[in-house]
């Protein structure tokens, strides 16, 4: 890897760490309490070797064993060990609390921010990758953060405390320990740089794998119908192999951390034992002091092993957190203007003035588009796939902003209207049905949670959904599984229609609204729609021209332009593009 990329990774890692510390800073009192408990835990832990050394000297240094003094020391050791256990338990509890609250804060922030992102981001990123960032990556981050809290505080304090005690016993031998121990730090630092890159690739590839799995599960019927299983398996195998490769390399580097540092620390321990034995023989220290010193040397080197493991886990945590912060840093939809108007008393006057729009800068989709819709008019938009029909709907709802020109409702540019008030004045039934996990009643009342039972049933009857609902096991209390898996496509669309029937806003958008309903049901729904559209401005997008014959005006689109405009009969008489589309559907019959 080039030095430039290394610097970028290092800067990204440091920036991510700083942001994590900002989140942790919200719980500073918990951190302070954890530090105090860590200090108590370390102090008590370091007190035990002193007592052990004194006990050894009581046995070795005198002709007769002082059993009374030895008993007092043993009671002190027992008390210190007991208090250490209690303080360590409290510290771990506080650390767990801080960790999971920080994780909750970041996950909530990521989810809330996700709902503010423009549809362009959602359309451009696989849903599986987004889910992986909010779920899997944050879980990985929490594991590393928890280990950091649990071991980092006590590790640093233990190193400082043991160093002071060793200096008080024998400065020269302490120098041996201090000189040799940094070798393990060098080893851990070298490995940490390698593991961060591998863990980052691992997280990114895990997101790819989640995205592919999510895509396959959501379209299993299509995959099987076209015999695409083998190709899907190849894609899965390729991504899975890359994930295994990154995981193995990350594990390889992380797995050699502890053995390497333990080897160095064992060398330190051996050096202390040899020099300490020589000091005892020469009378520079007692056997009890050597016992204490060996214990301190072990305690001094042990945190380096733990910290090296913590550093490895933190690299994984930082790599995962970086992906989450990338999502959080995505540019949100611009807030409504401070003086944005709330849309009220809507009659349904809509104007599109010289509108230009493109999803990508190099391909203009809508160009010089003009449309004037009077209140209560039913406007049908037809044309071949990709001509811009659904894009017009996206612009009307302000899911996307126009590149140039303007869209007005009641004479006001929709960019000067709050998004919420604009969208609540539209009722929308889309080709892609969406139902939340919950009861049928909850789904119908999605736009009006306060609706009464009578209103919900009336809306279902108007949408011709009441009959099949009553045949369900629990009627309106039947729980719909994920994405309506226990309903047919037609039933799901009828429920979406009932949802709009309940709200009855002044403007309607029907995008391929009856594409998944059988002909008999479609006739009933069309009658219900006709009643619903009376006095309401309605935009109907459909490929099946039989659904738009009664429209007040039909816009025929081609390559982002209106090429024809008029009523059904007028357009047929002209014999133009509309007549060509119509005849292609019905002439064969």
Question: Where are each of the predicted segments found?
Answer:
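An intracellular "coupling" helix at the cytosolic face of ABC transporter transmembrane type-1 domains
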Residues: 119-120, 136-145, 149, 157, ...
